[in-house]
């Protein structure tokens, strides 16, 4: 292991009781506690002369840290990276799509190796499949009073304001759909720090019996959900991949029978598809097994229903209206279509009906990144302020653009030459087609879905919001495509 770095004169001395190892990259001493009588912490003890008789090795569970070789067995029993018992709501691949390997050739031609003719054929298929689709969405750029103070706080920089504007618009759209209210459970997919749920909770004020389930597959620092102390709001964080989440086994939903509102801000690619399946297929199926009518059948048999979104009342079964549905609504900001996957995609039937399959989907998802590639180039060449450009860089860092982004300087890497504007239009068509499959899926499941722009592209290049509510006759007029 690397020997302890020499102490920099400007750094001073290590804190008493702390490790004496100087971290060159951070220009400071390690802040870990050293054992009594030792100069270094366990991680850096191998560098010290007094500890060189004991060998440290990489932990086999997580090579990001080391452990004494003679204490490996003991360490493996308590290592934070050890596999933990699966919770009751974990069911392997319950929200995954059907695996059909026969539809995808073993070796697809890399996108960069496509001939000019192959690329032209793909673009022709894309344009034919997109005929009749509305290539632009309605503007639903909104805000909400709950974020007024934060949006006008001078201490918030451009990056923070950018995210606050998006959260405010999502919150405004949730309210417009009449999904803000008491006695329900908000499930935030890809929750991260939980800030979207945080603002929903603030907007609800003193609403009774509100639960929040925050789903995130990785450990997250600086979470905000742990700071809430309202007696009528309960926050629960589930560290699990959405692909394996069985919502009807989560205790609060199993026992409380609260209607669910699925929300998410920038739910990347495949995560959107497994989240939709988690909500409208896996979760709804648990109620159908209890001899409750499927949503689509209830809508067909109830043409006179005027209430678009009735809340489940707390109490006995007799208090629950006949039109109660497990999923009250869905509001998800989409992004990263290049991270979609044919196996998990919910719009397979839509693609097949258009004569398209896994191969076309494979290439369309990669070309979808051109939508924001073209916009980024035009922004860089415009009079956009440096602050706005920094915000765009931050957005690109938050959501990886994938390996198929093309800038203006390397258009010749494609078979034939496509201008930035042409790539941008093609990318948008790819996104539109993928999203259209999701809309059809939701319609078939008894929902009235829609796509809308929820924020300005200068705030976020990924500015499309997917919303859906149960398609009762009265809601179909208000929530059209």
Swiss-Prot record:
Residues the entry annotates as binding Zn(2+): 59, 65, 75, 79
Keyword Transcription regulation appears in the UniProt entry: no
Coiled-coil ranges (or none): 113-140
Pfam family, one: zf-TRM13_CCCH
Any single biological process term in GO: tRNA methylation
Superkingdom per UniProt: Eukaryota
Signal peptide (from-to): none
Task of the protein: tRNA methylase which 2'-O-methylates cytidine(4) in tRNA(Pro) and tRNA(Gly)(GCC), and adenosine(4) in tRNA(His).
Family: Belongs to the methyltransferase TRM13 family.
Protein name: tRNA:m(4)X modification enzyme TRM13 homolog
Organism: Mus musculus (Mouse)
GN (gene name): Trmt13
């Amino acid at each position: 292991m690397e020997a302890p770095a020499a102490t920099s004169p400007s750094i001073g001395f290590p804190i008493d009781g702390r490790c004496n190892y100087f971290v060159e990259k951070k220009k400071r001493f390690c802040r870990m506690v050293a054992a009594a009588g030792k100069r270094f912490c366990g991680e850096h003890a191998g560098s010290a002369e007094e500890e060189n008789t004991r060998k440290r090795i990489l932990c086999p569970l997580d090579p990001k840290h080391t452990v004494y070789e003679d204490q490996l067995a003991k360490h493996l029993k308590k290592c934070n990276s050890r596999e933990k018992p699966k919770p009751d709501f974990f069911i392997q691949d319950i929200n995954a799509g059907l695996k059909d390997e026969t539809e995808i050739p073993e070796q697809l031609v890399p996108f960069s190796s496509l001939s000019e003719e192959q690329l032209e054929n793909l673009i022709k298929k894309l344009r034919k499949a997109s005929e009749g689709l509305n290539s632009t969405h309605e503007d639903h750029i909104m805000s909400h009073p709950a974020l007024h103070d934060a949006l006008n706080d001078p201490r918030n920089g451009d990056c923070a304001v950018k995210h606050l504007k998006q959260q405010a618009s999502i919150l405004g759209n949730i309210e417009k759909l009449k999904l803000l209210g008491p006695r329900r459970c908000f499930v935030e997919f890809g929750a991260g720090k939980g800030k979207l749920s945080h603002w929903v909770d603030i907007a609800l004020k003193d609403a009774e019996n509100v639960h929040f389930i925050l789903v995130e597959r990785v450990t997250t620092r600086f979470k905000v959900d742990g700071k809430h102390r309202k007696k009528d709001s309960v926050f629960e964080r589930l560290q699990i991949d959405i692909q394996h989440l069985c919502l009807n086994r989560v205790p609060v939903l199993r026992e409380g029978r609260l209607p669910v509102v699925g929300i998410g801000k920038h739910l990347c690619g495949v995560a959107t598809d497994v989240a939709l399946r988690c909500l409208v297929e896996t979760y709804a199926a648990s109620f159908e097994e209890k001899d409750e009518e499927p949503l689509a059948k209830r809508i067909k048999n109830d043409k006179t229903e005027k209430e678009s979104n009735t809340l489940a009342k707390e109490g006995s079964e007799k208090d629950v209206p006949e039109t109660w549905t497990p999923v009250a609504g869905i509001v998800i900001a989409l992004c990263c279509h290049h991270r979609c996957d044919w196996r998990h995609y919910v719009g397979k039937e839509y693609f097949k009906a258009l004569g398209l399959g896994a191969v076309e989907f494979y290439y369309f998802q990669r070309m979808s990144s051109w939508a924001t590639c073209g916009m980024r180039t035009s922004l860089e060449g415009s009079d956009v302020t440096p602050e706005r450009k920094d915000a765009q860089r931050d957005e690109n860092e938050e959501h990886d653009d994938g390996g198929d982004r093309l800038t203006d300087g390397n258009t010749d890497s494609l078979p034939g030459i496509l201008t930035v504007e042409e790539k941008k239009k093609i990318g948008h068509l790819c996104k539109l087609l993928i999203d259209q499959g999701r809309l059809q899926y939701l319609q078939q499941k008894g929902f009235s879905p829609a796509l809308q722009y929820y924020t300005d592209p200068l705030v976020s290049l990924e500015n499309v919001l997917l919303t859906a509510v149960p398609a009762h006759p009265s809601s179909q007029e208000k929530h059209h495509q």
